[in-house]
UniProtKB/Swiss-Prot annotation:
<keyword id="KW-0694">RNA-binding</keyword>
<dbReference type="GO" id="GO:0003735">
    <property type="term" value="F:structural constituent of ribosome"/>
</dbReference>
<dbReference type="GO" id="GO:0005840">
    <property type="term" value="C:ribosome"/>
</dbReference>
<dbReference type="GO" id="GO:1990904">
    <property type="term" value="C:ribonucleoprotein complex"/>
</dbReference>
<comment type="similarity">
    <text>Belongs to the universal ribosomal protein uL16 family.</text>
</comment>
<keyword id="KW-0699">rRNA-binding</keyword>
<comment type="subunit">
    <text>Part of the 50S ribosomal subunit.</text>
</comment>
<dbReference type="InterPro" id="IPR047873">
    <property type="entry name" value="Ribosomal_uL16"/>
</dbReference>
<keyword id="KW-0820">tRNA-binding</keyword>
<dbReference type="InterPro" id="IPR000114">
    <property type="entry name" value="Ribosomal_uL16_bact-type"/>
</dbReference>
<dbReference type="InterPro" id="IPR020798">
    <property type="entry name" value="Ribosomal_uL16_CS"/>
</dbReference>
<protein>
    <recommendedName>
        <fullName>Large ribosomal subunit protein uL16</fullName>
    </recommendedName>
</protein>
<dbReference type="Pfam" id="PF00252">
    <property type="entry name" value="Ribosomal_L16"/>
</dbReference>
<dbReference type="InterPro" id="IPR016180">
    <property type="entry name" value="Ribosomal_uL16_dom"/>
</dbReference>
<keyword id="KW-0687">Ribonucleoprotein</keyword>
<dbReference type="GO" id="GO:0000049">
    <property type="term" value="F:tRNA binding"/>
</dbReference>
<dbReference type="GO" id="GO:0019843">
    <property type="term" value="F:rRNA binding"/>
</dbReference>
C-alpha cells in the first residue's frame, strides 16, 4: 500500500476541505480519467482496491496512472481508553481529494472507451467520493487542427 517513506512530523491536524482542486485537475498522461465530484479522504487501501479492480479488468491491455498519493496520517486512540493523555498513534494514510481532482488515468493503444469506462466504473465502487468518467477525444483535436489549416487556405484563396 502507498505511504510516504519519511515525513517531517508523525502527526497532522485534520484540516478542512474547501474549494475546488487547482492542481491535478487536467488529464496529463492517458486518454481516459476518473475525476472527483465531491471532497473527501481516500485511504491507501481504497486506492489499492480501485487499482486492483481496474488492472484485473483491463488485464494487460493498457496502462494505469494513479494521480493521488496518501500523504496525510490519520491517528486513532485505542478502544475503551479515557480522554486525555495525548493524541493517538497514526493508524493509516489518506489522500485529501477536492472536487475536480483527477484520481486515476488510463491509456494505451489497446484500450477502447468502453473498456476504460467499465474499468473506471469498477474502481468507482471502491471509492468514498462521487466521481465521473472523462476522456480526451484525439479525433476532435486533429479535426480542429485540420479545419484551421483549411480555413487559412480558403482565406488565402479569397485574397488571390
Amino acid at each position: 500500500m502507498l505511504s510516504p517513506k519519511r515525513t517531517k512530523f508523525r502527526k497532522q491536524h485534520r484540516g478542512r476541505m474547501r474549494g475546488v482542486a487547482s492542481k491535478g485537475n487536467t488529464i496529463a498522461f492517458g486518454q481516459f480519467a476518473l475525476q472527483a465530484q465531491d471532497c473527501g479522504w481516500v485511504t491507501a487501501r481504497q486506492i489499492e482496491a480501485s487499482r486492483r479492480a481496474m488492472t484485473r479488468y483491463i488485464k494487460r491491455g493498457g496502462q494505469i496512472w494513479i494521480r493521488i498519493f496518501p500523504d496525510k496520517p490519520v491517528t486513532m486512540r485505542p478502544a475503551e481508553t479515557r480522554m486525555g493523555s495525548g493524541k493517538g498513534n497514526p493508524e493509516f494514510w489518506v489522500a485529501v481529494v477536492k472536487p475536480g481532482r483527477i484520481l486515476f488515468e488510463m491509456g494505451g493503444e489497446d484500450i477502447t472507451e468502453e473498456t476504460a469506462k467499465e474499468a473506471m466504473r469498477l474502481a468507482q465502487y471502491k471509492l468514498p467520493v462521487k466521481t465521473k468518467f472523462i476522456s480526451i477525444d484525439k479525433n476532435l483535436e486533429v479535426s480542429s487542427q485540420e479545419n484551421t489549416k483549411n480555413s487559412k487556405k480558403s482565406q488565402e484563396e479569397v485574397k488571390q
